[in-house]
């Protein structure tokens, strides 16, 4: 056992002495040590229930003959960190989480890992660590939040963000906004639509790192407890058969994840997180070009908020990710091994009772292309991304005058002052991995635009978007402004033309004009210290997953 490195032999006497201080006895020293990375915290709705859920996991580990060791790692709620300086820390937290889990597992030589994340950066951060460590591991994602009810309508967190703009523009009363605030988020779980957290949970299940049904089993459900207990039992199968993340996280498994992502119309943040996870696995190559290549091949078959009206509970009731994968079986790599110790094909054999009104077949798609597209052009020579599944057909092609801002705050103020009108192309720059730093989410600007019913405004940025953003929002523009990217040359009144169908984004200037402007640009300087200063020095471009180098 790997844990023998800290508990076996005379040279480990002092180590055992410390373990005995933790309550272990002679019999425990013969058992496998199972590390449990728990991201419980009191301030993140997606994580508040993990304190209780982990007790179920520990109980099963003891029953199965192991010794559970719970340790904590951080979790940031992007909704609470939104639209202030806290959002600079959200994406960088992914690296801290990965490093924390790696450090704990190496320092204490766990034989296997159970990972318990829920929200946006915690899921990829933990899987990045599992891939680095390459010891048997299984993921128990915390599960979605139930939606709320407001005046008879089903609502979620994004309804609240957009309602702020509606209230500021006189389309909603403050009394109704207050009522909505109180009922939209009724309890534990990740926000109720297919936003980043739930997208990553779905892809974790697709890749085979969590048990079938885990992603859509809601946080407050008995099913989530059952899956948590089953996962704790399954870790021993993985340990006994030496099935490691490198056996599961293959090139084919990543391609399956991207295909399901495209079929669901998932968050554009997956174009950061999936390449970042893949970067930790030898022999795997995942780029944003792969997303776009597959987007031409994989149809959009399940319309979920923010791209549609369904929420995660509807997907759960329709059969969950097993049903989605069953409908896609003909285009998936079904020989991939999963944490069940069986293949994808074997996992799907008994899947039935699919609600085809929610999860369409490949022959009856909602749209013929996948939910994410990658655009190129003189604004983004290295690419940028758009969730085309959440864009109205009439905005897939758009050309308009630019309103340019060097920060999210400047843009939000302009929207609140009614300076943005239909037809505009809003440009927010110096919000990339290095420029922010930290590549903040632009949910407040997009929600403010939608709340004001400015449905013919496009927004482009070297920052990123919440999984809850909808409309013609183009992010991850690479290279970013802080790295001398052409987005830094755009001026108020310039025309930018977007054609999602042709995958192009163009600033209507010549190459020489852009070069001349860039030669005169004075980059925005940030007064940084601490972790953000370190992150800025190490962060790579969005088209590389914003990983650290």
UniProtKB/Swiss-Prot annotation:
Entry note: cofactor: Binds 1 [2Fe-2S] cluster per subunit. This cluster acts as a Lewis acid cofactor.
The keyword Calcium belongs to this UniProt entry's keyword annotation: no
BP GO annotations: isoleucine biosynthetic process; L-valine biosynthetic process
Cofactor(s) the protein needs: [2Fe-2S] cluster; Mg(2+)
Binding site for [2Fe-2S] cluster: 119, 191
Active site: residue positions: 466
EC number: 4.2.1.9
SUPFAM superfamilies from the UniProt entry: IlvD/EDD N-terminal domain-like (SSF143975), LeuD/IlvD-like (SSF52016)
Gene3D superfamilies tied to this protein: IlvD/EDD C-terminal domain-like (3.50.30.80)
Listed GO MF terms: 2 iron, 2 sulfur cluster binding; dihydroxy-acid dehydratase activity; magnesium ion binding
Record InterPro entries: Dihydro-acid_dehy_C (IPR042096), DihydroxyA_deHydtase (IPR004404), DiOHA_6PGluconate_deHydtase_CS (IPR020558), ILV_EDD_C (IPR056740), ILV_EDD_N (IPR000581), IlvD/EDD_N (IPR037237)
Pathway: Amino-acid biosynthesis; L-isoleucine biosynthesis; L-isoleucine from 2-oxobutanoate: step 3/4; Amino-acid biosynthesis; L-valine biosynthesis; L-valine from pyruvate: step 3/4
Keywords, alphabetical: 2Fe-2S, Amino-acid biosynthesis, Branched-chain amino acid biosynthesis, Iron, Iron-sulfur, Lyase, Magnesium, Metal-binding
Binding site for Mg(2+): 78, 120-121, 441
Example of a GO cellular component annotation carried by this entry: cytosol
Modification N6-carboxylysine, positions: 121
UniProt xrefs under PROSITE patterns: ILVD_EDD_1 (PS00886), ILVD_EDD_2 (PS00887)
UniProt-listed NCBIfam families: ilvD (TIGR00110), PRK00911.1 (NF002068)
Family note: Belongs to the IlvD/Edd family.
Purpose: Functions in the biosynthesis of branched-chain amino acids. Catalyzes the dehydration of (2R,3R)-2,3-dihydroxy-3-methylpentanoate (2,3-dihydroxy-3-methylvalerate) into 2-oxo-3-methylpentanoate (2-oxo-3-methylvalerate) and of (2R)-2,3-dihydroxy-3-methylbutanoate (2,3-dihydroxyisovalerate) into 2-oxo-3-methylbutanoate (2-oxoisovalerate), the penultimate precursor to L-isoleucine and L-valine, respectively.
Protein's recorded name: Dihydroxy-acid dehydratase
Gene name in the database record: ilvD
């Amino acid at each position: 056992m790997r844990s023998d490195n800290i508990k076996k032999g005379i040279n480990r006497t002092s180590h055992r002495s410390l373990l005995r201080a933790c309550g272990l006895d002679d019999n425990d020293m013969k058992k496998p040590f199972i590390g449990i990375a728990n991201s419980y915290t009191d301030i993140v709705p997606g994580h508040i229930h993990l304190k209780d859920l982990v007790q179920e996991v520990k109980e099963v580990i003891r029953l199965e003959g192991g010794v559970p060791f719970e340790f904590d790692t951080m979790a940031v709620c992007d909704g609470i960190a939104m639209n202030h300086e806290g959002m600079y820390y959200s994406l960088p937290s992914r690296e801290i989480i990965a490093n924390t889990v790696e450090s704990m597992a190496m320092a204490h030589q766990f034989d296997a890992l159970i990972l318990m994340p829920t929200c946006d950066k915690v899921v990829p951060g933990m899987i990045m660590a599992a891939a680095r460590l390459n010891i048997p591991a299984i993921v128990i994602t915390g599960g979605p939040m139930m939606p709320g009810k407001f005046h008879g309508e089903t609502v979620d967190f994004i309804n609240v963000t957009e309602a702020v703009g509606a209230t500021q523009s006189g389309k909603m009363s403050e009394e109704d906004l207050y009522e909505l605030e109180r009922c939209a988020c009724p309890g534990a779980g990740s926000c109720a639509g297919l936003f980043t957290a739930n997208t990553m949970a779905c892809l974790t299940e697709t890749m085979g790192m969590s048990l079938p049904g885990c992603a859509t089993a809601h946080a407050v459900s008995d099913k989530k407890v059952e899956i948590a207990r089953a996962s704790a039992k399954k870790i021993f199968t993985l340990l006994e058969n030496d099935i490691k993340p490198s056996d599961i996280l293959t090139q084919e498994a990543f391609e399956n994840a991207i295909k399901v992502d495209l079929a669901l119309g998932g968050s554009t943040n997956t174009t950061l997180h999936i390449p970042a996870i893949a970067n930790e696995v030898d022999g795997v190559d995942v780029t944003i070009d792969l997303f776009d290549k597959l987007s031409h091949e994989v149809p959009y078959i399940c319309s979920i908020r923010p791209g549609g009206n369904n929420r995660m509970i509807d997907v759960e009731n329709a059969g969950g990710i097993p049903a989605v994968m069953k409908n896609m079986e003909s285009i998936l790599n079904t020989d991939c091994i999963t944490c069940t110790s069986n293949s994808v094909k074997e996992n799907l054999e008994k899947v039935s009772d699919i609600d085809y009104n929610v999860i369409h077949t490949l022959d009856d798609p909602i749209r013929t292309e996948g939910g994410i597209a990658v655009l190129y052009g003189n604004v983004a020579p290295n690419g940028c991304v758009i969730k085309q599944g959440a864009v109205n057909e009439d905005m897939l092609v758009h050309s308009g005058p630019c309103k340019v801002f060097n920060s999210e705050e400047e843009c939000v103020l302009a929207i609140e002052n009614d300076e943005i009108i239909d037809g505009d192309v809003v440009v927010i720059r110096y919000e990339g991995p290095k420029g922010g730093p930290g590549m903040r989410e632009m949910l407040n600007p997009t929600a403010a635009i939608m709340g004001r019913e400015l449905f013919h405004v496009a927004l482009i940025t070297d920052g990123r978007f919440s999984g809850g953003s909808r409309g013609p929002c183009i992010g991850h523009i690479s290279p970013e402004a802080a790295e001398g990217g052409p987005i830094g040359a755009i001026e108020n009144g310039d025309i930018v033309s977007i054609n999602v169908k042709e995958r192009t984004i163009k600033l209507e200037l010549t190459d020489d004009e852009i070069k001349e402007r860039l030669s005169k640009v004075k980059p925005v300087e940030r007064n940084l210290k601490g972790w953000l200063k370190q992150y800025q020095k190490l962060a790579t471009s969005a088209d590389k997953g914003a990983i650290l180098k």
